[in-house]
A protein has these predicted regions:
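Mature catalytic domains of secreted/periplasmic carbohydrate-active enzymes
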Residues: 2-516
């Protein structure tokens, strides 16, 4: 079944039988039994006892993957499955012009071309390891409703059609072998309304044969019903039990009031199952979907205005224009991505950096090169990132970050007077790092926060050095600044990283009045 544009249509006779999930009573009872075992209850008072794992606070850098059927049209963004059905959009017009009427070639018809025939999960994991990633979060299911894992709750999954393999499970196994912590993301909640545009005109969304894929296709203004909420919960439970992710990332829309009791049940179930596994886990959430302190807050394409007292996360992409593979990406520069990492870490956050693989299972050469370049920088400068904590102040300089979400629309040009700070305390001593965001034209870094006048350094400086093999030519400390004269830049995407080794703190001598 081939369309005029050359892509094969989905053969209805090739579909596996639909899965009956109309009665979830037994599955929900198993969830509630696991919650009853504790230690967490499904109420916010109990869930606020959660503590962010040390491994996550140390990790700092992870890889996000938006892979799926939407990479086949490779047009606009990962929301193509929605916007192609919204009349008046450029995606709708593009689809008509390229693939014909939506009733004859719908979103489902991209599935046969989503083959991932060149997929090499071990090579992917090795690339992520070279990039310096400590954890990986592949999309388990996006808004389109196509599961990238083997599922007993839907026939629309990668193990039964398209690639015909458990691509999520294969990547997580390869990540284990590369000592990368496994995670997964769920974007299922929005599927309640995601395909609703196709219900307003003659399209395959109206075909009852595909209701279990395109549905519910309800209005966004309406609250999800009990069946959708239970299915969301049990699909997520399936991911938890089958793959045991240590990071579980949720997209928006679970902050809708109807989700609240189900979110609490899910969190208690996940935390209790992790306790049974002997694993420390993380839930990432947006907006106000979770009570403060019960999980890890996530900002999309943004940053904080200052240091947050508890760990958080910034999820962003190598592309300014899309999260999935599309033709004609507007890529960020490597320097911009490293600055995002430094900025996030200086404010007590982790950076989750997204790439979008192609439908043949390969990663675009440009995206591979970006990851390799980040890894090369971290190989020489990672001491200022991994395992660090925020210093007294996060940043210095004239170019301040814009706080909030979706603030990466254009590259910000930093100066050599812009710094981000981190600190480390371990058995070898106390250290403070100043990450310069640009190289000084005159060769002198002037770090005002290290001047004697501000009194921000509690200890004397034992030594000053540069990470990454750079050379310190001279050091002068005045009331106004620490001035570090450095050699020529060695091709780093950003400026030098200054390392201060501080003298040990002076501990007051104890006077023993009883045995003096």
């Amino acid at each position: 079944m081939t369309a005029p544009h050359g892509l094969p249509r989905l053969d209805p006779d090739s579909l596996p039988p639909a899965v009956d999930v109309s009665d979830s009573t037994a599955a929900l009872a198993e969830v509630d039994a696991a919650i009853a075992q504790g230690p967490y209850r499904d109420d916010w008072d109990s869930l606020r006892a959660y503590e962010v794992p040390r491994w996550y606070a140390d990790a700092k850098f992870g890889i996000f993957l938006h892979w799926g059927v939407y990479s086949v049209p490779a047009f606009s963004s990962e929301w193509y499955s929605r916007t192609m059905y919204l009349e008046g959009t450029r995606e709708h017009a593009h689809h008509l012009e390229t693939y014909g009427p939506h009733s004859e070639f719908g979103y489902k018809d991209f599935i046969p071309s989503f083959t991932m025939e060149d997929y090499d999960p071990a090579a992917w994991a090795a690339l992520f390891r070279r990039a310096g990633a400590q954890f990986v979060v592949p999309v388990a299911e996006h808004h389109d409703g196509f599961a990238m894992y083997e599922s007993d709750r839907t026939r629309w999954n990668a193990a039964q059609m398209g690639p015909r393999r458990d691509v999520l499970g294969d990547l997580l196994a390869a990540s284990d072998d590369a000592s990368i912590v496994r995670g997964a993301s769920s974007h299922r909640a929005e599927h309640w309304f995601f395909m609703n545009g196709g219900a307003r005109f003659d399209s395959d969304v109206l075909d009852p044969a595909y209701q279990d894929f395109y549905g519910p296709a309800q209005r966004e203004e309406t609250a999800p019903n009990e069946r959708h909420l239970e299915d969301w919960l049990l699909r997520t439970v399936e991911i938890i039990d089958r793959y045991r992710p240590q990071v579980l990332w949720f997209d928006w829309w679970i902050e809708q009031p109807a989700f609240e009791p189900y979110v609490r049940r899910l969190a208690a179930y996940y935390y209790n199952r992790a306790a049974q596994w002997g694993r420390e886990v993380v839930i990432n959430y947006k907006w106000e979907a979770f009570a403060e302190g019960s999980a890890v807050y996530d900002i999309e394409r943004g940053t904080m205005g200052g240091i947050r007292p508890v760990p958080w996360q910034n999820d962003t992409s190598v592309s300014r224009s899309s999260w999935c593979w599309v033709e004609g990406h507007e890529y960020k520069s490597v320097g911009e991505l490293i600055i995002e990492l430094a900025d996030t870490v200086s404010k007590n956050g982790n950076l989750l950096l997204n790439i979008g693989p192609k439908p043949d299972g390969t990663i675009a050469a440009e995206e591979q090169e970006m990851l390799e370049s980040i890894g090369a920088w971290l190989a020489g400068h990672g001491e200022s990132i991994f395992g660090t904590r925020p210093w007294i102040v996060a940043e210095e300089g004239p170019t301040r970050s814009q706080a909030g979400s979706f603030v990466d629309g254009a590259e910000v040009h930093h100066t050599a007077a812009d710094f981000r700070f981190t600190t480390r305390h371990d058995v070898t001593g106390d250290y403070v790092y100043a990450i310069a965001l640009a190289h000084p034209e005159d060769g002198v870094l002037r770090i005002r926060s290290f001047g004697t006048g501000l009194r921000l350094l509690p200890q004397e400086i034992r030594s000053v050095s540069l990470l990454g093999g750079g050379e310190v030519l001279d050091v002068q400390r005045t009331e106004d600044a620490l001035e570090v004269t450095v050699g020529p830049g060695a091709g780093s995407p950003i400026g030098p990283v200054v390392k201060l080794h501080l003298e040990p703190e002076v501990v007051p001598e104890r006077t023993d009045h009883l045995h003096g």
